[in-house]
Amino acid sequence: MSRTPIIAGNWKLHMNPEQTTEFVDAVKGKLPDPSKVESLICAPAVDLDALRKAAEGSNLHIGAENCYFEDEGAYTGETSPKVLKEMGIDYVIIGHSERRGYFHETDEDINKKAKAIFANGMKPIICCGESLETREANKQEDWVVAQIKAALDGLTAEQVSSLVIAYEPIWAIGTGKTASSDQAEEMCKTIRETVKDLYNEETAENVRIQYGGSVKPANVKELMSKPDIDGGLVGGASLDPESFLALVNYQD
């Protein structure tokens, strides 16, 4: 099974609409063929319209950083998955460690969001990963397997084949500790084996798994050489056009 690599920038709470347009103008003629590498930017909700307009006709896919699990209602401050689809959004990040940590999102919330995203014809990027405390207790596999089982509950094999899972070791973010490419591969392999156990081998071979711990131009080739790593969920290194281009064109 040949999986198309997917490099996704997660801008977090950075960039305004003007900066967004400037960024896309700088990269859109230099992106790889989407059959080789899928290039994706996930932007703050306030930038999505500018991002979509600037990227029109290019190889850049558009993603949101979050959404709610209801299409409409009295949910002040939330983002509707139905409206995201109407805007032309392709992917939505859910379950990011910052959402779980700062905003107390639960596995149940993330599962509901995954179902809402599929119901509206988009694809979720489901994040998972363990803390330093969990890693030092050697419980990382149990932790991540439990997250995956909860996130995928009730999804069909066809749906799981089309989504993206992003492994982000929380212990390697801002701690001075670094996950080696072998550690990243070990966990991505565990995730794939979990999907196989829950569904079947074909589904496990289809699902794309990203690594999301300080991916940058200097380490992207080594990470992408690993058999179970199909892409990167990139934070800071995706904010600069030249850096983002170096990441998505890592095969050159």
From Swiss-Prot:
UniProt KW keywords: Cytoplasm, Gluconeogenesis, Glycolysis, Isomerase
Catalytic activity reported: D-glyceraldehyde 3-phosphate = dihydroxyacetone phosphate
Compartments it resides in: Cytoplasm
Pathway(s) per entry: Carbohydrate biosynthesis; gluconeogenesis; Carbohydrate degradation; glycolysis; D-glyceraldehyde 3-phosphate from glycerone phosphate: step 1/1
Residues at the active site: 96, 168
Source domain of life: Bacteria
GO CC terms, sorted: cytosol
Xref: Gene3D superfamilies: Aldolase class I
GO biological process: one example: glycerol catabolic process
Residues binding substrate, per UniProt: 10-12, 174, 214, 235-236
GO molecular function: triose-phosphate isomerase activity
Claim: Protease is one of the keywords in the record: no
EC number: 5.3.1.1
CDD domains: TIM (cd00311)
InterPro entries registered for this protein in UniProt: Aldolase_TIM (IPR013785), TIM_sf (IPR035990), TrioseP_Isoase_bac/euk (IPR022896), Triosephosphate_isomerase (IPR000652), Triosephosphate_isomerase_AS (IPR020861)
Keyword Cytoplasm: yes
Functional note: Involved in the gluconeogenesis. Catalyzes stereospecifically the conversion of dihydroxyacetone phosphate (DHAP) to D-glyceraldehyde-3-phosphate (G3P).
PANTHER family: TRIOSEPHOSPHATE ISOMERASE (PTHR21139:SF42)
Assembly with partners or alone: Homodimer.
Family: Belongs to the triosephosphate isomerase family.
HAMAP family (UniProt xref): TIM_B (MF_00147_B)
Protein name: Triosephosphate isomerase
Gene (name only): tpiA
